């Protein structure tokens, strides 16, 4: 039986936590930042967790995580 390939793009975007969840970076913080408030940018800079509904897809992309 061959090894299952890891989706490399997903491996760079998600990190598994000790409790079994996945951390992810929030979007909308790369460009066009002048119109966004400081508060909005500050809240976007923190890591977020992958939703439970999407966790199945992430696990399929990262078989050895």
From Swiss-Prot:
**Which cellular component appears as one GO term in the record?**
cytosolic large ribosomal subunit
Key words of the record: Ribonucleoprotein, Ribosomal protein
Q: Coiled-coil region(s) at which residues?
A: none
Q: Does the keyword rRNA-binding apply?
A: no
InterPro entries according to UniProt: Ribosomal_bL35, Ribosomal_bL35-like, Ribosomal_bL35_CS, Ribosomal_bL35_sf
Query: In Gene Ontology terms, what is a biological process of this protein?
Result: translation
Q: List the disulfide bonds.
A: none
**Quick one: where's region Disordered?**
1-26
This protein's source sits in the domain of life called Bacteria
GO MF term (any one): structural constituent of ribosome
Q: Read off the NCBIfam families from this record.
A: rpmI_bact (TIGR00001)
Q: Family assignment?
A: Belongs to the bacterial ribosomal protein bL35 family.
Q: Which HAMAP family match?
A: Ribosomal_bL35 (MF_00514)
Q: What is this protein called?
A: Large ribosomal subunit protein bL35
What organism is listed for this UniProt entry?
Haemophilus ducreyi (strain 35000HP / ATCC 700724)
Gene assigned in the entry: rpmI
């Amino acid at each position: 039986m061959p090894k299952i390939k890891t989706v490399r793009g997903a491996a760079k975007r998600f990190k598994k936590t000790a409790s079994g969840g996945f951390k992810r970076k929030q979007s909308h913080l790369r460009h066009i930042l002048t119109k966004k408030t400081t508060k909005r940018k500050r809240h976007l800079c923190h890591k977020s967790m992958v939703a439970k509904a999407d966790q199945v897809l992430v696990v399929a992309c990262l078989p050895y995580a």
